[in-house]
């Protein structure tokens, strides 16, 4: 996907594509940024991820499908689709690591990323699920706009500092096959 957007009198080029090993440096920087700025929204620990080797990062790219959103050629957003390896779960997929830089919010980049993920998922699974911080109404509304529905609440799902956060479990059908 590629397109242009005019914002504050400036034309920006937006594009979304699957990330590759060539995107390692930008992907690593974006992921660590997301974990440090919004620790209550991600289960991963920034210090542990920062300590990962390049090979460990690249292994993730080979075991999941990572989409990158670019603004004027700069990686500014990401989302990851993963599929369980167990045969009984092969009809399901998971959405993870959804993040768009503050400067790129409101540009349509998040919508383009989620559309790319849903398009990919619809060719591979029947339903996709995700968890989202129950105190993040903007993210919840975003996922609802993309067809996700809350199906449960996970109390005290994350413990960050001295606070606990609940997560909502959300689900979306992407295929009508039985």
Indicate where each model-derived feature is located.
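Glycine-rich acetyl-CoA-binding "A-motif" of GNAT/NAT acetyltransferases
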Residues: 74-77, 138, 164
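Acetyl-CoA-dependent GNAT
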Residues: 21-29, 33-103, 114-120, 173-177
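Conserved active-site alpha-helix within GNAT-family acetyltransferase domains
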Residues: 107, 111, 135-153
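Conserved GNAT acetyl-CoA-binding A-motif
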Residues: 121-131
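Conserved beta-strand-loop-alpha-helix junction that forms the acyl-donor binding cleft
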Residues: 130-140, 157-161
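Short hydrophobic/aromatic beta-strand or adjacent loop that forms the aromatic wall/cage
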Residues: 64, 165-169
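Conserved N-terminal entry element of GNAT/NAT acetyltransferase domains
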Residues: 1-22, 29, 33, 168, ...
């Amino acid at each position: 996907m590629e397109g242009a957007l005019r914002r504050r009198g400036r034309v920006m080029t937006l594009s979304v594509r699957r990330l590759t090993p060539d995107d390692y440096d930008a992907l690593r920087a974006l992921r660590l940024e997301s974990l440090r700025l919004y620790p209550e929204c991600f289960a991963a620990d920034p210090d542990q991820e920062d300590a990962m080797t390049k090979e460990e990062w690249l292994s993730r790219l080979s075991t999941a499908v990572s989409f990158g959103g670019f603004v004027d050629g700069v990686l500014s957003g990401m989302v990851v689709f993963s599929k369980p390896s167990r045969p009984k779960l092969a009809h399901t997929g998971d959405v993870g690591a959804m993040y768009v830089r503050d400067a790129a919010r409101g540009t349509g980049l998040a919508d383009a990323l989620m559309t790319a993920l849903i398009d990919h998922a619809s060719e591979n699974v029947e339903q996709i699920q995700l968890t989202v911080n129950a105190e993040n109404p903007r993210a919840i509304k975003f996922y609802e706009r993309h067809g996700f529905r809350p199906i449960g609440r996970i109390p005290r799902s994350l413990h960050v500092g001295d606070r606990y956060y609940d997560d909502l479990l959300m689900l979306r059908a992407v295929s009508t096959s039985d």
